[in-house]
Amino acid sequence: MSRVAKAPVVIPAGVEVKLNGQVISIKGKNGELTRTVHSAVEVKQEENTLTFAPREGAVDGWAQAGTTRALLNAMVIGVTEGFTKKLQLVGVGYRAAVKGNVVNLALGFSHPVDHELPAGITAECPTQTEIVLKGADKQVIGQVAADLRAYRRPEPYKGKGVRYADEVVRTKEAKKK
Protein backbone atom coordinates (compact mmCIF):
# COMPACT_ATOMS: atom_id res chain seq x y z
CA MET A 1 0.00 0.00 0.00
CA SER A 2 1.22 3.46 -0.88
CA ARG A 3 1.87 5.79 2.02
CA VAL A 4 1.96 8.73 -0.37
CA ALA A 5 -1.60 8.07 -1.57
CA LYS A 6 -2.97 8.05 1.97
CA ALA A 7 -2.07 11.72 2.54
CA PRO A 8 -4.73 14.06 1.12
CA VAL A 9 -3.88 17.05 -1.07
CA VAL A 10 -4.97 20.27 0.64
CA ILE A 11 -6.53 22.80 -1.71
CA PRO A 12 -5.57 26.34 -0.61
CA ALA A 13 -7.89 29.34 -0.85
CA GLY A 14 -8.04 30.81 -4.34
CA VAL A 15 -7.60 27.45 -6.08
CA GLU A 16 -10.51 25.95 -7.98
CA VAL A 17 -10.65 22.20 -8.67
CA LYS A 18 -13.02 20.61 -11.20
CA LEU A 19 -13.54 16.85 -11.37
CA ASN A 20 -15.04 15.65 -14.65
CA GLY A 21 -14.85 11.87 -14.69
CA GLN A 22 -11.15 11.01 -14.96
CA VAL A 23 -10.15 14.55 -16.02
CA ILE A 24 -9.08 16.96 -13.27
CA SER A 25 -8.70 20.69 -13.85
CA ILE A 26 -6.93 22.91 -11.30
CA LYS A 27 -7.12 26.68 -11.68
CA GLY A 28 -5.20 29.29 -9.68
CA LYS A 29 -3.46 32.65 -9.97
CA ASN A 30 -0.69 31.21 -12.21
CA GLY A 31 -3.06 29.64 -14.73
CA GLU A 32 -4.93 26.39 -15.26
CA LEU A 33 -3.54 22.85 -15.48
CA THR A 34 -5.44 19.76 -16.62
CA ARG A 35 -4.54 16.08 -16.20
CA THR A 36 -6.22 12.78 -16.96
CA VAL A 37 -6.17 10.43 -13.98
CA HIS A 38 -5.32 6.74 -14.41
CA SER A 39 -8.37 4.48 -14.62
CA ALA A 40 -7.22 2.47 -11.56
CA VAL A 41 -7.48 5.54 -9.29
CA GLU A 42 -10.57 7.06 -7.71
CA VAL A 43 -10.30 10.74 -6.73
CA LYS A 44 -12.77 12.33 -4.30
CA GLN A 45 -13.10 15.99 -3.40
CA GLU A 46 -14.19 16.72 0.17
CA GLU A 47 -14.43 20.44 0.99
CA ASN A 48 -10.83 21.66 0.58
CA THR A 49 -9.03 18.32 0.17
CA LEU A 50 -8.55 15.69 -2.51
CA THR A 51 -8.33 12.05 -1.41
CA PHE A 52 -7.10 9.10 -3.45
CA ALA A 53 -7.92 5.39 -3.40
CA PRO A 54 -7.54 2.49 -5.82
CA ARG A 55 -10.60 1.26 -7.69
CA GLU A 56 -11.90 -2.19 -6.82
CA GLY A 57 -9.99 -4.94 -8.60
CA ALA A 58 -7.11 -2.75 -9.81
CA VAL A 59 -3.81 -4.62 -9.62
CA ASP A 60 -1.57 -1.54 -9.50
CA GLY A 61 -4.14 0.67 -7.76
CA TRP A 62 -2.10 1.86 -4.77
CA ALA A 63 0.97 2.57 -6.89
CA GLN A 64 -1.07 4.60 -9.37
CA ALA A 65 -2.88 6.39 -6.52
CA GLY A 66 0.46 7.48 -5.02
CA THR A 67 1.70 8.70 -8.39
CA THR A 68 -1.55 10.58 -9.04
CA ARG A 69 -1.41 12.22 -5.61
CA ALA A 70 2.16 13.44 -6.23
CA LEU A 71 1.27 14.79 -9.69
CA LEU A 72 -1.86 16.62 -8.48
CA ASN A 73 0.03 18.06 -5.49
CA ALA A 74 2.62 19.45 -7.93
CA MET A 75 -0.22 20.95 -9.98
CA VAL A 76 -1.66 22.70 -6.90
CA ILE A 77 1.77 24.09 -5.97
CA GLY A 78 2.31 25.16 -9.59
CA VAL A 79 -0.90 27.19 -9.89
CA THR A 80 -0.31 28.88 -6.50
CA GLU A 81 3.46 29.45 -6.21
CA GLY A 82 4.89 28.27 -9.52
CA PHE A 83 8.17 26.48 -10.16
CA THR A 84 11.62 27.78 -11.11
CA LYS A 85 14.66 26.03 -12.55
CA LYS A 86 18.07 27.70 -12.85
CA LEU A 87 20.72 26.84 -15.41
CA GLN A 88 24.35 28.02 -15.61
CA LEU A 89 26.56 28.29 -18.68
CA VAL A 90 30.20 27.48 -17.92
CA GLY A 91 32.79 28.08 -20.63
CA VAL A 92 34.63 30.86 -22.43
CA GLY A 93 32.24 32.68 -24.77
CA TYR A 94 29.16 30.79 -23.59
CA ARG A 95 26.26 33.26 -23.38
CA ALA A 96 22.48 33.27 -23.19
CA ALA A 97 19.88 35.89 -24.06
CA VAL A 98 16.09 35.88 -24.08
CA LYS A 99 14.08 37.55 -26.83
CA GLY A 100 10.34 37.09 -26.34
CA ASN A 101 9.71 33.37 -26.04
CA VAL A 102 13.03 32.34 -27.63
CA VAL A 103 16.22 31.57 -25.70
CA ASN A 104 19.31 32.38 -27.77
CA LEU A 105 22.43 30.42 -26.79
CA ALA A 106 26.06 30.86 -27.88
CA LEU A 107 27.69 27.55 -26.94
CA GLY A 108 30.85 27.40 -29.02
CA PHE A 109 29.17 26.11 -32.16
CA SER A 110 29.64 27.83 -35.53
CA HIS A 111 26.05 29.06 -35.23
CA PRO A 112 23.85 30.39 -32.41
CA VAL A 113 21.26 28.00 -30.97
CA ASP A 114 17.66 29.28 -30.71
CA HIS A 115 15.28 27.35 -28.47
CA GLU A 116 11.59 28.26 -28.56
CA LEU A 117 9.82 28.04 -25.20
CA PRO A 118 6.45 26.28 -24.93
CA ALA A 119 3.33 28.16 -23.81
CA GLY A 120 3.20 28.90 -20.09
CA ILE A 121 6.99 28.97 -19.60
CA THR A 122 8.95 32.20 -19.23
CA ALA A 123 12.72 32.65 -19.16
CA GLU A 124 14.97 35.44 -17.99
CA CYS A 125 18.71 35.96 -17.92
CA PRO A 126 19.92 37.82 -14.80
CA THR A 127 23.46 37.54 -16.22
CA GLN A 128 24.78 36.33 -19.58
CA THR A 129 25.70 32.98 -18.06
CA GLU A 130 22.47 32.26 -16.15
CA ILE A 131 19.00 31.22 -17.31
CA VAL A 132 15.99 31.16 -14.97
CA LEU A 133 12.92 29.25 -16.18
CA LYS A 134 9.55 29.90 -14.52
CA GLY A 135 6.12 28.36 -14.97
CA ALA A 136 3.24 26.48 -13.39
CA ASP A 137 3.82 23.01 -14.89
CA LYS A 138 6.69 21.22 -13.13
CA GLN A 139 6.99 18.56 -15.81
CA VAL A 140 7.27 21.05 -18.70
CA ILE A 141 9.85 23.18 -16.84
CA GLY A 142 12.00 20.12 -16.20
CA GLN A 143 11.74 19.07 -19.85
CA VAL A 144 12.70 22.54 -21.15
CA ALA A 145 15.67 22.65 -18.75
CA ALA A 146 16.77 19.18 -19.93
CA ASP A 147 16.43 20.26 -23.58
CA LEU A 148 18.60 23.36 -23.00
CA ARG A 149 21.19 21.28 -21.11
CA ALA A 150 21.26 18.70 -23.93
CA TYR A 151 22.66 21.26 -26.40
CA ARG A 152 26.01 21.17 -24.54
CA ARG A 153 26.14 18.82 -21.56
CA PRO A 154 28.92 19.45 -19.01
CA GLU A 155 32.02 17.59 -20.12
CA PRO A 156 34.02 15.70 -17.48
CA TYR A 157 37.48 17.23 -18.00
CA LYS A 158 36.96 20.99 -17.70
CA GLY A 159 33.28 21.05 -16.72
CA LYS A 160 32.31 23.28 -19.64
CA GLY A 161 28.70 23.22 -20.77
CA VAL A 162 25.15 23.96 -19.63
CA ARG A 163 24.42 22.68 -16.13
CA TYR A 164 21.69 22.95 -13.54
CA ALA A 165 22.50 25.50 -10.83
CA ASP A 166 22.60 22.83 -8.11
CA GLU A 167 24.42 20.23 -10.24
CA VAL A 168 27.88 19.08 -9.20
CA VAL A 169 30.00 18.06 -12.18
CA ARG A 170 32.66 15.52 -11.25
CA THR A 171 35.79 16.28 -13.23
CA LYS A 172 38.30 13.66 -14.29
CA GLU A 173 42.04 14.00 -14.07
CA ALA A 174 43.83 14.57 -17.38
CA LYS A 175 45.87 11.76 -18.93
CA LYS A 176 49.41 11.58 -17.57
CA LYS A 177 52.51 10.87 -19.62
Swiss-Prot record:
Keywords: Ribonucleoprotein, Ribosomal protein, RNA-binding, rRNA-binding. The keyword S-adenosyl-L-methionine does not apply. This is Large ribosomal subunit protein uL6. GO terms for molecular function: rRNA binding; structural constituent of ribosome. GO terms for cellular component: cytosolic large ribosomal subunit. The keyword rRNA-binding applies. Part of the 50S ribosomal subunit. Transmembrane segments: none annotated. The gene is rplF. Belongs to the universal ribosomal protein uL6 family. HAMAP family: Ribosomal_uL6_B (MF_01365_B). One of its GO terms (biological process) is cytoplasmic translation. Pfam families: Ribosomal_L6. This protein binds to the 23S rRNA, and is important in its secondary structure. It is located near the subunit interface in the base of the L7/L12 stalk, and near the tRNA binding site of the peptidyltransferase center. InterPro entries: Ribosomal_uL6-like (IPR000702), Ribosomal_uL6-like_a/b-dom_sf (IPR036789), Ribosomal_uL6_a/b-dom (IPR020040), Ribosomal_uL6_bac-type (IPR019906), Ribosomal_uL6_CS (IPR002358). PROSITE patterns: RIBOSOMAL_L6_1.
